[in-house]
């Protein structure tokens, strides 16, 4: 060790443990445009002041550790440390606080969601001083956003590729999700696409199982796509799930999909991981493939109100990592999703600039500086009676995906697809004529039934089906 280093390390160093708030709680700090800002919902252990809890979060997710170390003297902690700069109590909750933390940009590797999450959502979530911790939102500064490619193509490029405008896109998840042979699976895909859907989909856990290996599925689905396109004159697609046990195998499947000439592949981005997802997104942009993203495992992370990571953060991370579609809940179907909160992160997926709006759970203004947008996918327990509400809630830039709501039609898959397409076209036409979908939705569907026996049959089957449970995801 050089004398100079010895002197710097020894001067002013005092071993021991000191409160985090002495270093990491800085209420006077003015945030910078280049800071990554985080809003944490913190539940301290009894006896732990909120200032100490917030400072502990800032410390443990940046430069801090449990004791003073002499190597602190070898760098500038003021430059690199996270700072808890504001704390506010959560209305209606005992001993819960929103703690705002600012992180200097130099803490993070460029273009790496993996590194960003490892820092901000790493060991701190197991910290003993906290009873619970939830990351509610992140502000990603433009300087960091510009280090990411983002979605392979984005909303406008996808519409141009498909030549479909002025309405939501329609999809269907093939059921049963497991157990079909590749040929029967391809048959179901063909029937749905021929009936009027834009897309069909592999379910999230369809990879390459003994009953249906991936290569066989890809071949039969490609045949179904081309046959349906020839008969309808419309561009069609099937989300071929490229998720695999290794990145190399995943890319191999995407390469085969490209060689078949199909328009879109799929990835389970949470179970597959952000590194794999970003790699696939880069491949898709370079090779003209759209990328559909499934969020399998998200509820393990985001459903508890006081611990975990809110889905709006996972949605922002996906936009940075890359994906052209992502499942976002339905508001009206069988899966969790409160309306205002869902629309908050739907806007974060689609729009270029989103203002802070605490009523929708948006803690920070977010500027995406032209990063392409992501289409939200409404999927899970929806059927034709939901079409007016879905069209009104999600608007044109969305994918409405009916699995059981297509394949459960009493006359078969193709009539189920016809029913959904007729219902959608009726709702879009009514909206364009100035009718109120929220108030007149059922009447609009009944009118369309008069000239579509397929829709009438679907309406009869699902007239009593509702999923009325209180949403867990509230402010």
Curated annotation (Swiss-Prot):
Pfam families: RuBisCO_large, RuBisCO_large_N. The active site is at residues 175, 294. The record marks 334 as: Transition state stabilizer. The disulfide bond which can form in the large chain dimeric partners within the hexadecamer appears to be associated with oxidative stress and protein turnover. GO terms for biological process: photorespiration; reductive pentose-phosphate cycle. It catalyses: 2 (2R)-3-phosphoglycerate + 2 H(+) = D-ribulose 1,5-bisphosphate + CO2 + H2O; D-ribulose 1,5-bisphosphate + O2 = 2-phosphoglycolate + (2R)-3-phosphoglycerate + 2 H(+). Keywords: Acetylation, Calvin cycle, Carbon dioxide fixation, Chloroplast, Disulfide bond, Lyase, Magnesium, Metal-binding, Methylation, Monooxygenase, Oxidoreductase, Photorespiration, Photosynthesis, Plastid. Residues 1-2 form a propeptide. The modification N6,N6,N6-trimethyllysine is found at residue 14. The modification N6-carboxylysine is found at residue 201. Substrate binds at residues 123, 173, 177, 295, 327, 379. The modification N-acetylproline is found at residue 3. Its EC number is 4.1.1.39. Its cofactor is Mg(2+). SUPFAM superfamilies: RuBisCo, C-terminal domain, RuBisCO, large subunit, small (N-terminal) domain. Belongs to the RuBisCO large chain family. Type I subfamily. The basic functional RuBisCO is composed of a large chain homodimer in a 'head-to-tail' conformation. In form I RuBisCO this homodimer is arranged in a barrel-like tetramer with the small subunits forming a tetrameric 'cap' on each end of the 'barrel'. Heterohexadecamer of 8 large chains and 8 small chains; disulfide-linked. The disulfide link is formed within the large subunit homodimers. This is Ribulose bisphosphate carboxylase large chain. It comes from Clarkia xantiana. The lineage of its organism: Eukaryota, Viridiplantae, Streptophyta, Embryophyta, Tracheophyta.
């Amino acid at each position: 060790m050089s004398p100079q280093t010895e002197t710097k390390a020894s001067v002013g160093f005092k071993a021991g443990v000191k409160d985090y708030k002495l270093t990491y709680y800085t209420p006077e700090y003015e945030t910078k445009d280049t800071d990554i800002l985080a809003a944490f919902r913190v539940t301290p252990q009894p006896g732990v002041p909120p200032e100490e809890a917030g400072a502990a979060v800032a410390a443990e997710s940046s430069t801090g550790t449990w004791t003073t170390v002499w190597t602190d003297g070898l760098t500038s902690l003021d430059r690199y440390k996270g700072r808890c700069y504001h704390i506010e109590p959560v209305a209606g909750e005992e001993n819960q606080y929103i703690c705002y933390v600012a992180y200097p940009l130099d803490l993070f590797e460029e273009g790496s969601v993996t590194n960003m999450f490892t820092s901000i959502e790493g060991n701190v979530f197991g910290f003993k001083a906290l009873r619970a911790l939830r990351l509610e939102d992140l502000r990603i500064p433009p300087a960091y956003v510009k280090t990411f490619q983002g979605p392979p193509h984005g909303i406008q490029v996808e519409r141009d590729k498909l030549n479909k405008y002025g309405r939501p896109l329609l999809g269907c998840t093939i059921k049963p999700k497991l157990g079909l042979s590749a040929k029967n699976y391809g048959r179901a895909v063909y029937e749905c696409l021929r009936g009027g859907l834009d897309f069909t989909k592999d379910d999230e856990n369809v990879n390459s199982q003994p009953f249906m290996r991936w290569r066989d599925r890809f071949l039969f689905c490609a045949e179904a796509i081309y046959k349906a396109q020839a008969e309808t004159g419309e561009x069609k697609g099937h989300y071929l799930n490229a998720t695999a046990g290794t990145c190399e195998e995943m890319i191999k499947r995407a390469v085969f999909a490209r060689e078949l000439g199909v328009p879109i592949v799929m990835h389970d981005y949470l179970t597959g991981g952000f590194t794999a997802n970003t790699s696939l997104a880069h491949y898709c942009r370079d090779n003209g493939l759209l990328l559909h993203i499934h969020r399998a495992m998200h509820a393990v992370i985001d459903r508890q109100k006081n611990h975990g990571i809110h889905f709006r953060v996972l949605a922002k991370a996906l936009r940075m990592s890359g994906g052209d579609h992502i499942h976002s809940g339905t508001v009206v179907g069988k899966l969790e999703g409160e309306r205002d909160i869902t629309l908050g992160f739907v806007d974060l997926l689609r729009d270029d600039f989103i203002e802070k709006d605490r009523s929708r759970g948006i803690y920070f203004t977010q500027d995406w500086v032209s990063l392409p947008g992501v289409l939200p996918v409404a999927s899970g327990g929806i059927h034709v009676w939901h079409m007016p509400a879905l069209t009104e809630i999600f608007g044109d830039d969305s994918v409405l995906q009916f699995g059981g709501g297509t394949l459960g039609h009493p006359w078969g898959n193709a009539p189920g697809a016809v029913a959904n397409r007729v219902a959608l076209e009726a709702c879009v036409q009514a909206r364009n004529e100035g009718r109120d979908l929220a108030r007149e939705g059922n009447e609009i569907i009944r009118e369309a039934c008069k000239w579509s026996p397929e829709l009438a049959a679907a309406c009869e089957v699902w007239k009593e089906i509702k999923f009325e449970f209180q949403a867990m995801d509230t402010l």
